Amino acid sequence: MALWRASDNMVYLPPPSVAKVVNTDDYVTRTGMYYYAGTSRLLTVGHPYFKVPMSGGRKQGIPKVSAYQYRVFRVTLPDPNKFSVPESTLYNPDTQRMVWACVGVEIGRGQPLGVGLSGHPLYNRLDDTENSPFSSNKNPKDSRDNVAVDCKQTQLCIIGCVPAIGEHWAKGKSCKPTNVQQGDCPPLELVNTPIEDGDMIDTGYGAMDFGTLQETKSEVPLDICQSVCKYPDYLQMSADVYGDSMFFCLRREQLFARHFWNRGGMVGDTIPTDMYIKGTDIRETPSSYVYAPSPSGSMVSSDSQLFNKPYWLHKAQGHNNGICWHNQLFLTVVDTTRSTNFTLSTTTDSTVPAVYDSNKFKEYVRHVEEYDLQFIFQLCTITLSTDVMSYIHTMNPAILDDWNFGVAPPPSASLVDTYRYLQSAAITCQKDAPAPVKKDPYDGLNFWNVDLKEKFSSELDQFPLGRKFLLQAGVRRRPTIGPRKRTATATTTSTSKHKRKRVSK
């Protein structure tokens, strides 16, 4: 007998519709006008390990300048709507606005390739856990030693119209702070912050807040022992809805472990007894298992350089295909292949002594960096239709404010008081409220500001990157000086031959 029964399958409803994010190519029209912009030579000099404060009558301190810092350039561009455009019919200011699109970039790096060392004169290392015949179970009060390392090798370039996002592990909060005892391991929390100029990169010890998570101040080299090391959050920037934080990125990382040590100090989490068989004599109590390697970036070579070569942006990884909103770019750069630290020596006497005495000389260390930025920008137009303006207002209302567009407030239904004698002492002060000052959204963040408002040129063939762009675009340059070939005038010549007369015999 056949029986009907309801299906056991669940009924799935379609997900609710979401607002669609469109690509900038859908509402931005690119023109055929290209401009070159470049900086002068950008130099910075400082101490590679820490900031030197003012002392000895010195009015200014020495900044911290390390190859293991991020260099974040905030590039300011001119307003294209106030730009002198040679073609007056290019756009209609009543119905259109102009924006810049970055189509080419070259990051020039000066100085020779080199390896710079970092270290700590009181580095926390107990035993050599790789080559020692046995590990000591004794825990001396102070086993720190003077150790230097060549850190992780990194080359990085991130370009976008907003700062790049970094991530690091910081000290979190406990759910039950009453149960936390002194000496317990703190909870960890993943924190996302903008990458600023001068922030430390991951040098091989991880991305974390060493100042709050390592209270010994001797677990890592001097340059990061009281700093926060950040790592770019590629996952979040790749998932950015509008794709403003990362048009594209270039990166190359290289690392291996040179030495293997363990840390001195009491082990916080003891090894469970069922994981080993108890020994005798010096092996009765296991030594510290808190292992830590010394990183090494190994050899640097010109064959693996990411800099001093042009890059062309045809299609960005996100929805923003190189459009520079707010007329600015953020360029995040890291290059540890030129990390040489200069050592300088000066004598404490008026003259250099004839016999060497180390007590009569002072040693200093400095690090220098050299940059040269070049860009190719394309002029673009945006037609201000209702849909486009509504979409831009949803994305970033400040863009419309920069274009002198604003939302009219609703009419007020309340009465407004209007006094007759405004200068009378019998009434309250009638001074107008001051206009609100436009606040910088990145106020308080540290960047290397680069102003290119007066460095744009349409003569691309006069600049190195411009000539490379014309070559890859297949545009032939017209000669401007020198003799020109004249067009030959057409002349008619007779090619007919006279026929010989036949003579009859």
Curated annotation (Swiss-Prot):
Cell compartment(s), UniProt: Virion; Host nucleus
Entry keyword annotation includes Nucleotidyltransferase: no
Region (Disordered): 126-145, 480-505
Entry's Gene Ontology cellular component terms: host cell nucleus; T=7 icosahedral viral capsid
Biased composition (Basic residues): 496-505
Main location: virion
Gene Ontology biological-process annotations: endocytosis involved in viral entry into host cell; virion attachment to host cell
Gene3D superfamilies: Major capsid L1 (late) superfamily, Papillomavirus
Keyword set, alphabetical order: Capsid protein, Disulfide bond, Host nucleus, Host-virus interaction, Late protein, T=7 icosahedral capsid protein, Viral attachment to host cell, Viral penetration into host cytoplasm, Virion, Virus endocytosis by host, Virus entry into host cell
Family in the record: Belongs to the papillomaviridae L1 protein family.
Protein name, per record: Major capsid protein L1
Organism whose genome encodes this protein: Human papillomavirus 68
